[in-house]
Amino acid sequence: MPSKSLVMEYLAHPSTLGLAVGVACGMCLGWSLRVCFGMLPKSKTSKTHTDTESEASILGDSGEYKMILVVRNDLKMGKGKVAAQCSHAAVSAYKQIQRRNPEMLKQWEYCGQPKVVVKAPDEETLIALLAHAKMLGLTVSLIQDAGRTQIAPGSQTVLGIGPGPADLIDKVTGHLKLY
């Protein structure tokens, strides 16, 4: 068995101390990130059982979030116009979710902020999708054009749905084709 002084000399060596400090810092950083990004196991959070149940029923089971932008195809907007209208819808949806549900916004951002653009054949379809999304409690943003360039003033151009649970949004827009 090594002598007590040899063990103490080994423990006092600078590289051993550096290793111990590095491991401790890594553990603290990992714990801080888990707390900051809400990645603690459910049993360690302060939510009650009923809060967790209602959240699961609202958010769905997949744990994935996305935003869908539905573009009216009958207006025959140019690519730049579509990009501008989709941007308006995305910013509007972001502002709403930031105010109403910052925790869901954080989850959507953690998922990489996925956005998908799909097309709807006409205004009636857009309005029906709006009603369905509202019924499911999803965030919606309907954009009306000012009419300064390509299309008539007040035309409803793009519907933003989400950010929200992907499986819930798919119930509204899953049948639509990509733009």
UniProtKB/Swiss-Prot annotation:
Catalytic activity, EC: 3.1.1.29
MF annotations from Gene Ontology: peptidyl-tRNA hydrolase activity
Bilayer topology annotation: Single-pass membrane protein
UniProt-listed InterPro entries: Pep_tRNA_hydro_II_dom_sf, PTH2
Cellular component terms per the entry's GO annotation: cytosol; membrane; mitochondrial outer membrane; mitochondrion
UniProt entry tagged with the keyword Mitochondrion: yes
Cross-link Glycyl lysine isopeptide (Lys-Gly) (interchain with G-Cter in ubiquitin) residue location(s): 47, 76, 81, 95, 106, 115, 171, 177
Segments passing through the bilayer: 15-37
UniProt entry tagged with the keyword Hydrolase: yes
Catalytic class of the enzyme: hydrolase
Chief location of this protein within or outside the cell: mitochondrion
Compartments it resides in: Mitochondrion outer membrane
Pfam families linked to this entry: PTH2 (PF01981)
Record-level GO BP terms: apoptotic process; negative regulation of anoikis; negative regulation of gene expression; positive regulation of anoikis
Modifications the protein undergoes after translation, according to the UniProt entry: Ubiquitinated by PRKN during mitophagy, leading to its degradation and enhancement of mitophagy. Deubiquitinated by USP30.
Disease: Neurologic, endocrine, and pancreatic disease, multisystem, infantile-onset 1: A progressive multisystem disease characterized by a variety of neurologic, endocrine, and, in some patients, pancreatic features. Variable clinical symptoms include global developmental delay, hypotonia, hearing loss, ataxia, hyporeflexia, facial dysmorphism, hypothyroidism, and pancreatic insufficiency.
Protein name per UniProt: Peptidyl-tRNA hydrolase 2, mitochondrial
